[in-house]
Amino acid sequence: MTWQSSLQLHFDCASNAAKTRLYHRAHTGALMVQRALYPEPDSTDSSQAGICHIYVLYPPAGIADDDRLTLEFDLHSNSHAVITTPGAGKWYGQRKSLRYSRPSDSSKFTNGTQSANSNTSNDCFNDVVSAEQHIDARLDDHAVLEWLPQESIYYDHSVSTANNRFYLAKTASLLTWDIAVFGRQAYQETFANGHYANRLEIWRESDLLVSECTAQQANTRWFTSPLGLNDQHVHGSFWAIPSTEVIAPELQNNPLKLGQYLDATITEIRNLIDTQSLPIHCTHNFQGINCRYLGADVRACFEAFYQIRELIRSKWYKLEPHRPRIWDT
């Protein structure tokens, strides 16, 4: 059975209130949410208790064949939403009847940055029958989105396409991570057959801040080369984009000044990495911070990202630590 599912979530924050409200939600198919949660503590910053937490539910528990999932997030000014998932995402192997419908020419799979002006879902991927997930998020001024899904597991014979696009107003801020697990090592199953395609774009108004596009056929050298995954099967990438308000208004268009602010955050992250022996590397591109994991332990990746997230939330947003309970169930 093929699932075509969509989910729209719109958030706002009244000017006289500190509580973010999920004021609109609409869904088709199996994608859904239950209700908005407000689990964060009261703090010296009274707005922390008003941060809205959402769990995205997908009852089929996995994506396969030519399923298509579309998620749209719209955050109005001053809203702050934490959106996550209750468990790992699973990209299942295709049915045998579909495995032979895709081209065998792996030369059509390329790595690199593509023009982000097109909204065509597969314009940097070859045409194959694939399961797809598309995420489109728009953040108004002073909005904060934390899109922090749990890991995605790519089964042998899975054919996947994921597109993640974030459009930020000048003073919006974003925290987002993606953790990919190739194969199921506990079952001695590797990602030996299939295709993996993943794109991330982060825009600030008309400026493209981040563009990553990976499209690889299983068993290519990208999975074994030191320039790729180096024979590891867990890869994580965490991007943190601050509001431009962190620097003086007259300097907001100067990337070097924002870079100096990010340098200070990077120094604190590296101190955390050293003291906690976290298996993470981090850097910045003068617009945002990127932390990466490459290894064999998905929980080590997740816990390291969590600790870095708490440091960033404290430094940038003056928030006390809070861990969504769903991450421990």
UniProtKB/Swiss-Prot annotation:
List where Polar residues composition bias occurs.
103-120
Query: According to the UniProt record, where is the region Disordered?
Result: 100-120
Location of this chain's protein in the cell? Cytoplasm
**Pfam families in the cross-refs:** UreD
Cellular component (GO) terms are:
cytoplasm
An example molecular function term from Gene Ontology annotations? nickel cation binding
Report keywords, A-Z: Chaperone, Cytoplasm, Nickel insertion
Stored InterPro entries: UreD (IPR002669)
User: To which protein family does this belong?
Assistant: Belongs to the UreD family.
Q: What function does the entry list?
A: Required for maturation of urease via the functional incorporation of the urease nickel metallocenter.
Binding partners and assembly: UreD, UreF and UreG form a complex that acts as a GTP-hydrolysis-dependent molecular chaperone, activating the urease apoprotein by helping to assemble the nickel containing metallocenter of UreC. The UreE protein probably delivers the nickel.
The identity of this protein, by name, is Urease accessory protein UreD 2
According to its UniProt entry, this protein's organism is Psychrobacter cryohalolentis (strain ATCC BAA-1226 / DSM 17306 / VKM B-2378 / K5)
Q: By which gene is this protein encoded?
A: ureD2
